[in-house]
Amino acid sequence: MIQNGINKDFINKDKSHNQKITKLTVMCMVYKEDGSFLVENRLKKDWPGLTFPGGHVEDEELIIDAVPREMKEETGLEVSNLEPRGYIEWNEFGDDVRHLAMLFKTKSFKGNLKSSKEGEIFFIKEEEIKKYPLSNDFLEIYKKLK
């Protein structure tokens, strides 16, 4: 079956490479002219502490479409004019699962902030970061997004 120019029967047919499962996610830094930026103080045990809002890219969804969807779901904000800022990757469950997070930033947003069961959403300045517990790789991600 060919879908979007990709033969789905061909993908992962060659098991000699022992490829890991890759989970594709997005993260976005929303920032203001005063230097503050949006963070989430996550409560979930799988990724606790300060992080940037984001989430998983759905099957058949374009990465660039996942960012506004996830930002609306997690923060209540509508974002636009996204600037790609690179990526980070890490392994989970030993080496069985690879995570690849595409990073974006923007100062174009509208709407009202809303927190969720995953954690509190708020704007913060760089000098306030040390007051909070940080998620894994937060400082590395922050440096890429600055």
Which residues fall in each region the model found?
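Active-site-adjacent beta-strand/loop module that shapes the phosphate/pyrophosphate-binding cleft
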Residues: 88-112, 145
